[in-house]
Amino acid sequence: MNLYTHISANKRSSWLLIIINGVLLLALGWVLSQAANDYIWFYIALIYSLVSSLVGYLWGDKVVLMSSKAKLVDRTAAPELYRLVENLCITAGLPTPKIYIINEAAPNAFATGRDPKHAAIAVTSGLLAKLDKAELEGVIAHELSHVGNHDILLATLVSVVVGAVALLGNWFARWSFWGGNRRSSNNDEAGQISVILSIIAIVLAILAPIVAQLIQLAISRRREFLADADGVLLTRYPEGLINALKKISADPQLLSVASEATAHLYFASPFDNKKRTPLLAKMFMTHPPVEERIAALEKISI
């Protein structure tokens, strides 16, 4: 798959994800409407579908940045970081994205946005403190490659959709417990509706993390290898990115602001994958194993 095919595939997948999100929510609304004999649920699902899709497309980056507690910085607050990003953007032929800093000791970074003209890069304070210039340049080049490859819209939409599924499951659980209990004492029909909503809440609670993993894996971890390779083409220095991967993967700090919905966005997994067995780690990690990324980079000759 060449770069242009990859970009086209990302755009198609982004729209497909929006459509699937809408269809599933409308199907859920229809089931509830039939169970309650009231089409208000279908209209609620329609509105929720439209709002979540619109938010994901237009403001998904802001949702992700807000949930990560990222703070926008200007040139005076981080002059060296700005110069580094601008120089790499000139090399890549990209507009300079907005730059954010996350006040976390764990070294990591991510890119988000709708397209290269509406992009943002967030780095942790730990990344700035623990990496040298060549290593930091490698990480930023990797994230800018995600911007140039149009990975960011799809990745951002996944975060919003996964978060919406989790929010919906939580809402159903609360509604069925509090609202359902009050109504179930009034008549048998209300009691039946409460049971149905409770079952849906349980199913959503079980499926939400599974759906999160499957959607994230569907993005394909191949994009990380491509961003690594493209990042090296920008810096012309594979060792910088290799050393950054080694240093970040060995760091004991965990990223407290990361969640299952946003884990796939980060440069490296924000969770402690060492606690899992090697087989499960390879099956469910949102990123390729670090040793595989390093091995691929070592084969690149500049």
Please provide the spans of the model-predicted regions.
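Polar-ligand-bearing catalytic/cofactor-coordination segments
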Residues: 1-23, 35, 41-43, 47, ...
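Hydrophobic alpha-helical transmembrane segments
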Residues: 29-36
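Hydrophobic alpha-helical transmembrane segments of integral membrane proteins
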Residues: 202-206
